[in-house]
C-alpha cells in the first residue's frame, strides 16, 4: 500500500472567529475555531488548516491565541496561513503550536523568503500556497495555461502556476497547497488538469483545494495526483462528512487513515 491520502478541513478565521458560517448541530459556539477543530479531530480529519483572513494587527495576536488553544485540544497536524510575511511570523506560529505554516503572497514578492524559512525551520514545516487559475482570454499567455493570482484570485501575479510550484520545490518547501481559483466555491469538482500538470512537475506532496461539492469529487483528484484533499464549505455545512470522503477515496482503491 502507498501512503494514506489525507483529508483536511480548512477554516477561515477573522479576528479569532470562523468566517464562513458553520452548520454543525450541538456545537456550543459554531464561530469558535477551537470548538470546530476539536469536532473535526473527532470526526477523523487527518490535518487541519487555519487561514487567517484578519487584515488588522490585532487579528494577528488573536490568531496566535487561537493556535495555542487549538494545539492544546487536538492531536493532528495544524497548518496556519494568511498574512505570513517573515521568519518572525513563522517562528511565532510554530511556537504557539502550529505544525506547518503556509506562505502565499509574500513569497511572490520575495521568493527567497521560502529558502530562508525552509533552512531555518525545515522543509516539513513550510507549505507554498498557490492560488492558480486558467489564464483568461486577452491576458499574456503562460506555458502551462495556468497563472498564479493574488488578492483572492482577482489579480494576476504574472507567473506560470506550474513554474511557480517548481520554483517552490527548488527553494525548499515541503508541500504545495494548490488552490484552483476557478473551482473555488463552485462545487463542480477539482481542476484535474491543473492538478495533473503540477503533479507531473514536482516530487513533493500536492494538496488539492477548490471545487469540492460531493464525496465523489475527491477520488478523481487523488487519481490526478493529489496526496491530500482540502475543503471548507462542504464540511462546515455538513453536506459531506470526512468519513464519506474517506469511504469514497478508499472505494476507488486508495489508502486512507482511519
Swiss-Prot record:
One of its GO terms (cellular component) is cytoplasm. The keyword Cytoplasm applies. GO terms for biological process: L-histidine biosynthetic process. It holds the Pfam family His_biosynth. InterPro entries: Aldolase_TIM, His_biosynth, HisF, IGPS_HisA/HisF, RibuloseP-bd_barrel. Belongs to the HisA/HisF family. PANTHER family: IMIDAZOLE GLYCEROL PHOSPHATE SYNTHASE HISHF, IMIDAZOLE GLYCEROL PHOSPHATE SYNTHASE SUBUNIT HISF/H IGP SYNTHASE SUBUNIT HISF/H. IGPS catalyzes the conversion of PRFAR and glutamine to IGP, AICAR and glutamate. The HisF subunit catalyzes the cyclization activity that produces IGP and AICAR from PRFAR using the ammonia provided by the HisH subunit. Heterodimer of HisH and HisF. This is Imidazole glycerol phosphate synthase subunit HisF. The lineage of its organism: Bacteria, Bacillati, Actinomycetota, Actinomycetes, Mycobacteriales. The gene is hisF.
